[in-house]
């Protein structure tokens, strides 16, 4: 599942680009609502104005990916929390504290949220806050398509056009696709529609032209769009168009709110949209400034961002990660050793699971003790699936650092507990759990052994990139090969980095200060 909704995507995307964004909405008192709020907050978005509606559920949409042009959508938005936003929910001081207010077109489609939007616009005008409209026309959300037909992007309707036209004078910036300006202008001809919009609003108009890019119109509508500047799009292979418009808007705002030129605003917007359509997700696919800088500085066009290793790595490391304090981690992912102890004591190995649940209580006590002593620290654990599944379940969702092993204990060459297809096992893992893999590795291993080990590690790293889980590599030089331990460790890490393997965490033996240097 991904965070979604046009407004939420834009709040997420602008925050990722370094803007101070905030979301004003409602969510249900449910798991999905909490997921949305947590996702926005983790990205740096202000969520203080998001209210919890105990009477309604959080809206959802199901997305299908058939081919490069077919993306069926089913919206579940009847009587949902965000569409119950009321005028009383709009705080004048909150609006006044903003530099810009963005509203998407769907928020004018029903009476209640329409009044709430007008209230927000009134406050924005009163306090000199820039007002932005993303037309974001979805016929199904205006009752013009079948309930399951979320894919249809345009249905002409005179009443909808009149309704949209009534709010156009209130905005300073209006952004939409060609089809969205057709509905706003109430015409089947784009230039005629744009002239109607211009007769109602002096706003800057940004027309999205799909793969061709976009154009910006400040004053009179030209005889042809080509008579103005067409800012070209980024050529990429399309995987999923959903979220592209929200990424475009995020990029455009990141320039527009800093008074950048039209060319720069459109460069940012087109690049953000291009990167998102080349990836599977919507909000999580939104780029960072570091990704955009790399894209713009590339000497050759990057048409497959999803396959560019540098861009993939930047997308991993330049997005916000949880800021851990000093960590106190209890490692009890031992399997074979505990089985041996159980057998030596004449005990049934199945009791190991109960033992590991006791270890959870130990972690809880340490966490409580650290709080009582005022120590700024986080706690965590390493636990295995074989004997520690109940412990993993108990630890998940508590804000703890949680990692679990995937390697067959003692294997050399490296083998995984659930076979070579480690990625198929990761599907069932909670996103917060970290992949831990211990490898007995030496850069001077016999070539066939070293290559097999490196292939396994690379496959695991690639699987972690797809699944979104962080990877922890524990490198232990085998005892049967010579060499000073610090030097071997240094060469091992350097070799893996050179192979393009960048785990989020390393687990290595402590070194002296001199050895670290």
Q: Where are the regions that the model predicts?
A:
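Conserved N-terminal subdomain of the carbohydrate kinase-like
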Residues: 20-105, 293-302
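Conserved, mostly hydrophobic/aromatic
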Residues: 330, 474, 506
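Conserved phosphate-binding/catalytic region of the ribokinase-like
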Residues: 122-126, 159, 186-309
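Alpha/beta catalytic barrel-like cores
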Residues: 302-445
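Conserved beta-alpha-beta core of the PfkB/ribokinase-like small-molecule kinase fold
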Residues: 100-196, 203, 211-220, 475, ...
